[in-house]
Amino acid sequence: MKDFIKINRAIDAKTLKEVQKNIEIRRKQGMYPDCFKYPLTLQFELTGQCNLACKHCYNRSGDADRDTLMTPDKWCDLARQIVSDGGIFQCIISGGEPLLLGDRLFDIMDILHEDGTSFVVITNGYLLTPEKVKRFSKYRFYWFQISIDGVTPEVHDEFRGVKGSWERAVKGAIEISNAGIPLVIAHTVTPQNIAQVEDMVELSFRLGASRIILGEVLPSGRAISNEDIILNHDEKNCLYGKIQELQMKYQNKIDIKRSGELSFQMKRYSIENNAGGIIRPNGEFRLDCMAPFIIGNVLKTPLKEMWLTHGINAWKSEEVQNFINSIDDDKQEGSIKNHIDKDILV
């Protein structure tokens, strides 16, 4: 078998060089600024609560509530502050499980929606109902992401810890697709389900998804205690080869993407201007899901002040660069255990 891992890493390396070159060209042409004076995109981790108990959860959602200090009222206050500062192009809604906020979720989204913000929603789909989907249909979406981790209820439900979760996710996906909202399926590939990858692509296509993201489990959060769900080298190589095959087979039917390797993602963020980050349930502003660094807390410091003081050049800091350089490509982890070790203030 070909070394598909090596091939994909070569493609990633070439992509990084092209991104760097394009940025330099656009800067010389005056088409790319030295920095962004305000985030273009923000991810709202609205709650640390979750109604499932997924083995791979990167941020350990549901573990003792994960310090949810940002109440719905505080999220609304933050949204108003963002609008007052000039607004953002994109808001990613996640958690935990964001639909646990009930009607208050829509209160938060309404504030940004009225200012022209478009959304990505990331959910396990369990709480989706026709009524909720109807309410979602008024917003502008880049996409609406539902996680389905098996072609059968048995595989998905065992992985996500709640019986009946597969059926609810599938029904929710159908409702989203039928409402004309762009549906993306996120599928975590493990040794237990890797043989059904093609079946999963077919299911996603039949559900009406425009894209499926096939990602391996990264050693972060709860996954660190569940090493049996992490692909070994041969399984990962097989997955990469299968993705290439399926991209050809399903061309013009459904977009099939693999999640990028950790070092590639981190290096790309370092090359580009910092364009955003994550507001966590405790108010901390985190650089990325997989980057264990914070620049402050919105409950203590205004977002704009924090961004201008620490956010713009955060990816260039010595601590972050040392972490990126420590990443082992085969193990997909660096010197800091993500969502296990304490995040570092930069």
Which residues are covered by each model-predicted region?
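Conserved alpha-helical substructure of the radical SAM core
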Residues: 2-143
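Radical SAM enzyme [4Fe-4S]-AdoMet core and its adjacent flexible, acidic
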Residues: 2-5, 66, 142, 149, ...
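Phosphate-coordinating loops and pocket residues in cytosolic domains that bind phosphorylated ligands
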Residues: 59, 130, 138, 158-161, ...
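Flexible mid-to-C-terminal extensions adjoining Fe-S/redox cofactors in radical SAM and related proteins
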Residues: 2-38, 288-346
